[in-house]
Design a protein with these regions (language model features):
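Short, conserved charged micro-motifs
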Residues: 26-30
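A broad, low-specificity signal marking well-ordered, structured residues that form hydrophobic/aromatic
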Residues: 8, 20, 58
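Solvent-exposed, well-ordered amphipathic alpha-helical segments
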Residues: 2-4, 24, 62, 98
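Short, mixed-charge low-complexity intrinsically disordered segments
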Residues: 36-98
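A short, exposed loop/beta-hairpin motif centered on an aromatic-Gly-Thr core
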Residues: 14-23
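Short aromatic-glycine-(Arg/Gly/Cys) micro-motifs in beta-strand/loop hairpins
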Residues: 2-15
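Short, solvent-exposed secondary-structure boundary/capping segments
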Residues: 32-34
Length: 98
């Protein structure tokens, strides 16, 4: 049996935040347990508030049609993150002090 990738949504404390592709739920759900993801989400902010803190609840579900569209638009525009994630929200700009 051949599976086609499905688009999934990661919710943080009930808010749809990221969309990404995975073949099956088990594969999609693994992202919730990745330390690098929690670190990245803790560094990204909205209105100067981190997206994710230590006690944030992360949940995976199938993406809704509007979220699928946003993911596909980001993929077509080559605006996915290095990890092939599409943010579904507007983030604060990343400031670099180099």
């Amino acid at each position: 049996m051949i599976f086609a990738p499905t688009i999934w949504t990661l919710e943080i404390d009930g808010k749809p935040t990221l969309a990404f592709e995975a073949l099956k739920y088990r594969e999609a759900d693994e992202i919730r347990h990745q330390e690098w993801l929690r670190l990245e989400l803790g560094q990204r902010k909205i209105n100067h508030v981190p997206l994710c803190v230590a006690d944030s609840r992360l949940r995976i579900r199938l993406a809704r049609p509007a979220e699928m569209l946003l993911y596909r638009q980001a993929a077509e525009a080559n605006k996915l993150s290095d990890n092939h994630l599409a943010y579904l929200i507007e983030l604060d700009p990343v400031v670099s002090f180099r």
